[in-house]
């Protein structure tokens, strides 16, 4: 009772194809594959060691030449 035979799974597959159609199942499969690929790429990119944080800060400061550095003063 706990396991299903191959015939049960084939009948379920046939019903799913009849309900959703092959085109929609193809779209779902390609979307799922794209999501898995994106996840793997994200994990692979995240595993590389980041550069020195001090170098990142100086690179950001040089890129923001129009930014004005101000300091807020409290009223007495």
Curated annotation (Swiss-Prot):
It comes from the Bacteria. It is found in: Cell inner membrane. One of its GO terms (cellular component) is TAT protein transport complex. Residues 55-65 have a biased composition (Polar residues). Keywords: Cell inner membrane, Cell membrane, Membrane, Protein transport, Translocation, Transmembrane, Transmembrane helix, Transport. The chain crosses the membrane at residues 1-21. GO terms for molecular function: protein transmembrane transporter activity. One of its GO terms (biological process) is protein transport by the Tat complex. The keyword Mitochondrion does not apply. It is a single-pass membrane protein. Residues 44-76 are annotated as: Disordered. The Tat system comprises two distinct complexes: a TatABC complex, containing multiple copies of TatA, TatB and TatC subunits, and a separate TatA complex, containing only TatA subunits. Substrates initially bind to the TatABC complex, which probably triggers association of the separate TatA complex to form the active translocon. Part of the twin-arginine translocation (Tat) system that transports large folded proteins containing a characteristic twin-arginine motif in their signal peptide across membranes. TatA could form the protein-conducting channel of the Tat system. Belongs to the TatA/E family. This is Sec-independent protein translocase protein TatA. It comes from Methylibium petroleiphilum (strain ATCC BAA-1232 / LMG 22953 / PM1). The gene is tatA.
